[in-house]
């Protein structure tokens, strides 16, 4: 054994590591490069991933050699009773007796830190208090890291340092859907190809650029000869229909499951959408991205590749990270983003891709 930066004993070759990252979908994508490096650095270790059951499909599509430990905290919170209590106790007992040497809390929430603590691992790694979503999480860590970098993917890689891992900042992990999802999307597209994919939705109301703007953007792109497809998430079909109406009815509507969404991204020429899971899926698939940012920070959460385009308004009040409504009542960070700005972003990203495809001029 050697010593961690804080002087505690470090397990140089851990046999079992518990990764804690519940979600959301985009957050899980951000965590993949760090877990990839754990696997590369400790090829003989067993690495388990504690994740919300609804998000485990993302890890499955990554192809990473981890054991998924699904958890359903939503059901536990909303279905209290003897059955749930028994299930929780059995889960905690299993966690404590699995013999983990180390846990890494990539989430930074009180519940994620607490579950890491319940694992009884002697080394529990997390961020310093100022970088946590819930500062009380700090009490459950034995090792804390103060990130030096801005992007969340980099910050998560920095959590590997107490284990003696020097982060490889260029590590990427691509998502690959199952063959059944690819076949389903091929059937839905029915020959439709070389298209721009728009995903207008998002769990946060404050991240959604309005349907009229997306519709006008689709119209501009189609006038340039670029086919446009629109997809959406649960409860967002009406937004997609409004885009179709504002665009003049000629966009391709493609409903998709989570796995089908990744397959759909594989077939797209360009992705356009907000700071949501689908945007991060598109980036992880490797297609060009134009991301529209409102109340969140593109420096921290934006697409990781430098060639991808972020459209945003630099304002003193952002980022505020408000989910449901603008605290100032205007949401100018999103409302003031014009169709022309996003259209120009699309042209810029497509031009870069075309230049990259042809190679440097002689």
Model region roles, listed by residue range:
Residues 1-362:
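Catalytic machinery of carbohydrate-active enzymes
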């Amino acid at each position: 054994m050697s010593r961690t930066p804080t002087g505690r004993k470090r397990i140089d070759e851990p046999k079992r590591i518990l990764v804690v990252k519940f979600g959301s979908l985009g957050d899980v994508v951000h965590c993949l490069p760090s877990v990839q490096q754990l696997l590369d650095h400790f090829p003989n270790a067993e690495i388990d991933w504690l994740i919300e059951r609804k998000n485990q499909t993302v890890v499955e599509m990554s192809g990473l050699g981890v054991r998924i430990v699904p958890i359903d905290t939503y059901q536990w919170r909303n279905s209290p009773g003897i059955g749930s209590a028994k299930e929780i106790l059995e889960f905690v007992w299993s966690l404590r007796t699995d013999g983990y040497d180390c846990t890494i809390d990539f989430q930074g929430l009180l519940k994620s830190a607490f579950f890491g603590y319940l694992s009884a691992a002697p080394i529990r790694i997390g961020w310093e208090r100022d970088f946590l979503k819930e500062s009380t999480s700090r009490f459950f860590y034995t090792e804390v890291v103060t990130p030096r970098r801005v992007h969340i993917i980099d910050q998560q890689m920095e959590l590997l340092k107490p284990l003696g891992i020097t982060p490889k900042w260029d590590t990427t992990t691509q998502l690959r859907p199952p063959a059944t999802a690819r076949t389903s999307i091929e059937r839905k597209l029915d020959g439709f190809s070389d298209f721009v994919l728009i995903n207008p939705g998002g769990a946060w109301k404050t991240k959604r650029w309005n349907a009229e703007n997306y519709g006008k953007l689709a119209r501009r792109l189609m006038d340039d000869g670029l086919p446009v497809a629109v997809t959406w998430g649960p409860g967002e079909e009406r937004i997609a229909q409004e885009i179709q109406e504002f665009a003049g009815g000629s966009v391709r509507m493609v409903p998709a499951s989570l796995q089908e969404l990744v397959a759909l991204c594989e077939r797209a020429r360009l992705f356009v959408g907000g700071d949501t899971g689908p945007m991060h899926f598109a980036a992880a698939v490797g297609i060009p991205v134009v991301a529209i940012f409102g109340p969140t920070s593109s420096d921290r959460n934006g697409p990781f590749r430098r060639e991808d385009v972020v459209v945003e308004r630099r304002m003193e009040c952002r980022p505020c990270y408000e989910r449901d409504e603008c605290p100032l009542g205007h949401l100018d960070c999103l409302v003031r983003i014009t169709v022309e700005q996003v259209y120009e972003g699309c042209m810029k990203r497509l031009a870069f891709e075309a230049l990259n495809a042809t190679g440097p001029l002689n």
